[in-house]
């Protein structure tokens, strides 16, 4: 795969501080831009629920593995975003057995300068097509490596193009050993 000048060389196996594993954390509603504006849905997680070293990590794009599970202690609820739109939290009750497997992910840790965010976020794009949204479900995931630093973009199209390149890089790396077998940690 052709590398971009900003891409960080990915080692043959994870090097410190990787792998970083999380416990199960909540999936929360973000700004609604991933699916609606970019066509790239993301699962947003509260950074304060993650291991402390995540907040100290360089901003940018990472890759790893993730596993979803329903949060069956909850009943469906309607949540309101800051923009007034409504999101149904079904707490993962509609996840099929297959959708509870382990999937490759691309993660963004940062401020999303294209959107001028004022709060650092962690957003995961899970490389799988899901039948339903799963706000409120639980997700456990790993950080296995770093693809590139966070960038600002002049156009939405350039951002989308780079995200698609990130997805290709992550998919390629995660299908090689030892990265592939690290999905068993989840």
UniProtKB/Swiss-Prot annotation:
Zinc or magnesium. Signal peptide: none annotated. It catalyses: riboflavin + ATP = FMN + ADP + H(+). InterPro entries: Riboflavin_kinase, Riboflavin_kinase_bac/euk, Riboflavin_kinase_dom_sf. GO terms for cellular component: mitochondrion. Gene3D superfamilies: Riboflavin kinase-like (2.40.30.30). GO terms for biological process: FMN biosynthetic process; riboflavin biosynthetic process; riboflavin metabolic process. It is an enzyme of class 2 (transferase). Keywords: ATP-binding, Flavoprotein, FMN, Kinase, Magnesium, Metal-binding, Nucleotide-binding, Transferase, Zinc. The active site is at residue 123. Its cofactor is Zn(2+); Mg(2+). Its EC number is 2.7.1.26. Pathway: Cofactor biosynthesis; FMN biosynthesis; FMN from riboflavin (ATP route): step 1/1. It comes from the Eukaryota. Belongs to the flavokinase family. This is Riboflavin kinase. It comes from Eremothecium gossypii (strain ATCC 10895 / CBS 109.51 / FGSC 9923 / NRRL Y-1056) (Yeast).
